[in-house]
């Protein structure tokens, strides 16, 4: 078969030119500056220019300097102004290290906004040394930081075309790099959206091959018959090897991206669902694009906008299945993404080609003026609209995700994503989407920037026929009518969780006027609690790193509120001047505990906000038990432990003693102190013995008619802090102690340990952190992982083939680790499959 490469090149060059014009059209001066200088700064290396790294490999094949770049050089490098003849040779080396530079993604599409990233593929020669690639990586890092000065985000991806074609593009997962999560689907997105900024053209775009699976053999034929020379092209390979195995990892990746870019991920995860519905005859959009481009069938109104092409494909899919509500949500998401950051007062907005095309779509969709106005006012949305939008987003994303999981089950696919990437992705998704008792749901901050309320009213309900017992918050001043109409904003069983929800979602700020209706909590107490919470926890902290996600979700900081909602000290009429510790927990002739409620708020290593509420005579016991169970042996102590007492009486004393108890229990649990010999505590007239075990505290009531001596805990609370002691070695443990450091509730975790004879041990922690041990296993660990993943995907379908008793939830995907024996002990790292990396 013969190909008209000359004609194809003209068409591709025209589209590149059009897309570059559209990328610059309506964009800021800063964006235009960075976009136009990008290739120049990769092509040359000079101390006066951004991105300079000594000995960095530079030079882009077939580079032609633009007038804008030439003027920039003349003003930035003074020596050039005197001798402009140096311009053509202004390069570090005569041999070009870079074969091509391409921008992909939303740039030049209807979804490009002032916040759009420049996702840039830098394809380098495959013979660069490791040292040269590291220098080039440093150069791109410096250019990334340079662009940030203009508020432009660039993500550089160093690409080796030969390595990519061999399915060996599996760099570590990062916030912008999908790692091993998707391969062919990534290439599909690249081909349909790529803009060549400089360098060699993409071979795949120029060859209209009828059977895509024959692409590689057809290229070999063209080379053999000397119709093409591969040195003239960049070739990442064809799209004929799309496997069903990619869908699961790709869906996880899109959910992951949906945390920070929700409306963009809506259309992308739906495209995956659409593709899976066509399997095994999936017709990728990139193939559709190439056929339309090379046969002259491109839509003249948008010249193949990749974002609109996704929308068209998704529209056909949802219409076919009569899912019109989902289609409406997708259209609203597309509109919100395309108009993100748009200033409607800008006189040039009406001349924006993106806005003009949106107007055509709105007419096709028959939208009302009220809906358009509501969407245009997204920046001003408040909590009720944001909650509705957030819940709709989660519902939509999770439905697509579950449909893709069902597809994986149906076709019994083995995920192509590597175990270490699964671990990071699922834990990230677990923190963002999994709803758990006591966990604060953080509304997506990308929906609206300002949720603050002028007034917040908290009211307590008990014994109502209309409302469930608990706490409610409304964004208004006290009004009976508001309650009757059930127009509350949020509900929680505990005040602690409700206040934390309002605070960490930026609804409650320093400028919010607080109101409360409660027989148990005064406005003064509420204000004190809010202030203590605000001063103890910043709303935002540094983003969780992938390294953090490989560790257990250790508590980083916590506050404890004593007697916030139940305060037994209000009933005390006679005040004792001297108080012993035992008196506080078993006070007066009725031996009542003066700790009526304990509320705990903590932030863990994964940046989750969790709350705990304990109420009743044994509140202190339950709080110590549950808190200790969340602290594992050898873990670092929380960076912040604050105890606040809101008691009517004995406020300071209660605070001090609860602080001492919590610190003592945590110190014992992490191994910084030894348990007291007589670890008894008398609470509400009963004697309790504490047993400090590997996974926390257990309690046992001691029944005795004899009067017990002062407890070890009481004595400890009255003495000075002891010097740090070393924990006794545990000789009863039958597994490496380092495993405890990685124990994470909610996940099934597998730890592989190699033996000297070639066999291996497997330590399994279930979702409740119970351990099972399998010793001297043989075979390949990679095959064991595939077996476990298959059981996970099939769990619930075949209960007889489930030896690990796996229960599938949304994001409890099995986690795999390797134990490495080192001189200073055992190190645990995410399992890296040698098969996947080979």
Swiss-Prot record:
Lineage, top ranks: Bacteria, Pseudomonadati, Pseudomonadota, Gammaproteobacteria, Pasteurellales
Key word Cytoplasm present: yes
Broad class of where this protein is predominantly found: cytoplasm
Top-level class of the enzyme under EC nomenclature: lyase
Region named Regulatory: 547-838
GO cellular component: cytoplasm
Name the UniProt record assigns to this protein: Adenylate cyclase
Region described as Catalytic: 1-541
Alphabetical list of PROSITE patterns matching this protein: ADENYLATE_CYCLASE_1_1, ADENYLATE_CYCLASE_1_2
Localization in the cell: Cytoplasm
Organism per entry: Pasteurella multocida (strain Pm70)
EC number(s) reported in the record: 4.6.1.1
Gene name of the encoded protein: cya
This protein's record includes keyword Amino-acid biosynthesis: no
């Amino acid at each position: 078969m013969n190909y008209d490469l000359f004609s194809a090149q003209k068409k591709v060059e025209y589209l590149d030119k059009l897309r570059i014009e559209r990328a610059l059209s309506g964009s800021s001066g800063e964006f235009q500056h960075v976009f136009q200088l990008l290739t120049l700064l990769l092509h040359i290396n000079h101390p006066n220019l951004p991105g300079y790294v000594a000995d960095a490999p530079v030079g882009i094949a077939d580079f032609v300097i633009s007038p804008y770049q030439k003027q920039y050089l003349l003003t930035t490098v003074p020596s050039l102004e005197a001798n402009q003849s140096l311009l053509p040779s202004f390069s570090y080396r005569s041999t070009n290290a870079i074969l091509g530079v391409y921008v992909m993604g939303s740039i030049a599409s209807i979804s490009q906004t002032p916040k759009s990233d420049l996702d840039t593929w830098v394809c380098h020669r495959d013979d660069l040394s490791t040292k040269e690639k590291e220098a080039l990586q440093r150069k791109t890092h410096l250019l990334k930081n340079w662009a940030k000065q203009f508020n432009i985000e660039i993500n550089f991806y160093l690409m080796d075309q030969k390595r990519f074609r061999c399915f060996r593009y599996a760099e570590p997962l990062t916030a912008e790099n999908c790692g091993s999560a998707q391969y062919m689907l990534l290439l599909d997105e690249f081909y349909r959206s790529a803009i060549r900024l400089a360098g060699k053209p993409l071979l795949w775009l120029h060859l209209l091959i009828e059977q895509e699976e024959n692409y590689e053999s057809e290229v070999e034929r063209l080379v053999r018959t000397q119709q093409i020379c591969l040195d003239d092209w960049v070739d990442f390979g064809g799209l004929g090897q799309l496997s069903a195995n990619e869908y699961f990892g790709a869906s996880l990746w899109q959910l992951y991206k949906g945390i920070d870019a929700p409306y963009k991920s809506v259309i992308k995860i739906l495209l995956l669902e659409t593709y899976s519905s066509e399997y095994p005859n999936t017709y990728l959009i990139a193939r559709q694009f190439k056929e339309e481009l090379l046969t002259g069938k491109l839509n003249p109104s948008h010249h193949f906008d990749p974002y609109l092409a996704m929308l068209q494909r998704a529209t056909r899919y949802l219409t076919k299945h009569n899912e019109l509500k989902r289609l409406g949500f997708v259209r609203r998401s597309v509109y919100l993404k395309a108009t993100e950051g748009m200033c409607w007062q800008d006189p040039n907005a009406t001349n924006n080609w993106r806005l003009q095309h949106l107007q055509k779509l709105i007419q096709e969709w028959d939208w009302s003026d009220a809906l358009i106005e509501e969407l245009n006012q997204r920046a001003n949305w408040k909590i009720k609209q944001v909650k509705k939008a957030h819940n709709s987003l989660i519902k939509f994303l999770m439905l697509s995700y579950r449909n893709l999981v069902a597809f994986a089950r149906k076709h019994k696919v083995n995920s192509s994503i590597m175990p270490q990437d699964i671990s990071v992705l699922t834990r990230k998704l677990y923190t963002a989407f999994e709803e758990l008792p006591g966990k604060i749901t953080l509304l997506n901050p990308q929906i609206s920037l300002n949720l603050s309320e002028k007034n917040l009213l908290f009211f307590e309900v008990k014994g109502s026929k209309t409302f469930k017992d608990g706490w409610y918050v409304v964004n208004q001043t006290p009004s009976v009518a508001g309650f009757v109409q059930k127009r509350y904003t949020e509900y929680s069983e505990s005040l602690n969780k409700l206040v934390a929800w309002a605070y960490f979602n930026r609804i409650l700020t320093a400028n919010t006027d607080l109101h409360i209706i409660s027989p148990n909590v005064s406005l003064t107490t509420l204000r004190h609690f809010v202030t203590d919470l605000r001063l103890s926890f910043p709303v935002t902290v540094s983003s969780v790193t992938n390294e953090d996600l490989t560790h257990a979700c250790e508590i980083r900081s916590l506050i404890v509120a004593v007697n916030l909602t139940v305060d037994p000290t209000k009933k005390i009429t006679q005040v004792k001047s001297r108080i012993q510790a035992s008196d506080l927990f078993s006070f007066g002739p009725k031996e009542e505990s003066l700790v009526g409620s304990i509320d705990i708020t903590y932030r863990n290593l994964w940046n989750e906000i969790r709350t705990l509420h304990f109420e009743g005579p044994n509140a202190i016991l339950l709080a110590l038990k549950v808190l200790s169970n969340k602290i594992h042996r050898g873990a670092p102590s929380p960076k912040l432990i604050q105890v606040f007492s809101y008691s009517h009486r004995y406020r300071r004393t209660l605070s001090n003693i609860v602080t001492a108890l919590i610190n003592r229990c945590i110190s014992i649990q992490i191994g910084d102190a030894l348990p007291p010999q007589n670890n008894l505590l008398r609470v509400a007239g009963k004697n309790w013995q504490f047993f400090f075990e590997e996974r926390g505290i257990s309690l046992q009531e001691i029944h005795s008619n004899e009067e017990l001596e002062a407890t070890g805990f009481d004595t400890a609370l009255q003495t000075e802090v002891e010097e740090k002691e070393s924990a006794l070695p545990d000789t009863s443990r039958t597994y490496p102690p380092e495993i405890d450091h990685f124990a994470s509730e909610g996940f099934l975790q597998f730890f592989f340990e190699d033996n000297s004879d070639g066999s291996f041990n497997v330590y399994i922690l279930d979702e409740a952190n119970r351990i099972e041990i399998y010793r001297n296993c043989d075979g390949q660990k990679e095959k064991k992982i595939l077996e476990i993943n298959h059981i996970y995907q099939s769990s619930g379908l075949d209960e007889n083939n489930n030896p690990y008793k796996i229960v599938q939830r949304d994001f409890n995907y099995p986690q795999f680790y390797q134990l490495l024996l080192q001189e200073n002990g055992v190190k645990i790292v995410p399992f890296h499959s040698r098969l996947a990396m080979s």
